[in-house]
Curated annotation (Swiss-Prot):
Database matches in InterPro entries: CodY, GAF-like_dom_sf, GTP_trans_reg_CodY_C, Transc_reg_CodY_N, WH-like_DNA-bd_sf, WH_DNA-bd_sf
Function comment: DNA-binding global transcriptional regulator which is involved in the adaptive response to starvation and acts by directly or indirectly controlling the expression of numerous genes in response to nutrient availability. During rapid exponential growth, CodY is highly active and represses genes whose products allow adaptation to nutrient depletion.
Keywords per UniProt: Cytoplasm, DNA-binding, Repressor, Transcription, Transcription regulation
Entry protein name: Global transcriptional regulator CodY
Organism: Staphylococcus epidermidis (strain ATCC 35984 / DSM 28319 / BCRC 17069 / CCUG 31568 / BM 3577 / RP62A)
Gene designation per UniProt: codY
NCBIfam families in the record: codY_Gpos (TIGR02787), PRK04158.1 (NF003170)
Length: 256
């Protein structure tokens, strides 16, 4: 397969995900297919965003790492110290992705590391490993292109997260501001009663304890639910199950 064909295969994957978040496991699988390598896509804090492993699955340590979804802190730090592409790293180098304890199995292995950059900052690392055969110039071009694409996707996800947080905060603020004084007081007592972000509420019990009518509680919950801040489900005589849908709601409630 030519370099152009391999590049197009990566582009095809991205076009399939246009407008939605890319699954980095799919990206890792595609990179593995076109480069014939073991692949790790790692965040700057060592979280495994995506991987596609073949020979490396023979190592129990690698299997444990995949279960934890994190690479060791020491290796993360070593990767972050790599400022530009480093290719054809052998098994005796501390940057090798292959487990040194299996040195005899991976004696001819080669590791290549591509820093993932975007928006003027380091976002993570693309690590490719081959059991044998050096990485050639075409491999390096493809790897650097893949790292650039991954960086763009990570930035897009970050941007989407910031936008979602802003929308959630606006919805929470509007919902809290729509409450009357007594309704806000009722909500504060409800979550004090629940002791967390979800639980079973008996409205009459809270109403009697606080000295407000049950209708105030019902109206307050209805306003929050219509704003998408909470969800509630009646369980009949048992009460009402309540769950917070917006993570920052309780923090914002305390501030108001």
């Amino acid at each position: 397969m030519s370099l152009l064909s391999k590049t197009r295969e990566l582009n095809t994957l991205l076009q399939k995900h246009k407008g939605i978040a890319v699954d980095f496991k799919d990206v890792a699988q595609t990179i593995s297919n076109v480069t014939v390598t073991n692949v790790f896509i790692v965040s700057r804090r060592g979280k495994i965003l995506g991987s596609c492993l073949n020979e490396l699955l023979k190592s129990e340590r690698i299997k444990d790492m995949l279960e934890d979804r994190h690479i060791p802190r020491e290796y993360t730090e070593e990767l972050m110290n790599v400022k530009q592409t480093e290719s054809n790293i052998d098994i005796d180098n501390e940057l090798t992705v292959f487990p040194p304890e299996n040195r005899e199995v991976f004696l001819n292995s080669r590791t290549t590391i591509f820093p993932i950059l975007g928006g003027g900052e380091r976002l993570g690392t693309l690590v490719l490993g081959r059991v044998q055969d050096d990485f050639n110039e075409n491999d390096l071009v493809l790897g650097e292109y893949a790292a650039t694409v991954i960086g763009m996707e990570i930035l897009r996800e970050k941007h989407n997260e910031v936008e979602k947080e802003a929308r959630d905060k606006a919805a929470i603020t509007m919902a809290i501001n729509s409450l009357s004084y007594s309704e806000k007081e009722a909500i504060e007592h409800i979550f004090e009663e629940l002791g967390g972000t979800e639980g079973l509420l008996i409205a009459s019990k809270v109403a009697d304890r606080v000295g407000i009518t049950r209708s105030v509680i019902v109206n307050a919950l209805r306003k929050l639910e219509s704003a998408g801040v909470i969800e509630s489900r009646s369980l009949g005589m048992k009460g009402t199950f309540i769950k917070v849908k917006k993570d920052k709601f309780l923090d914002e409630l305390e501030k108001k």
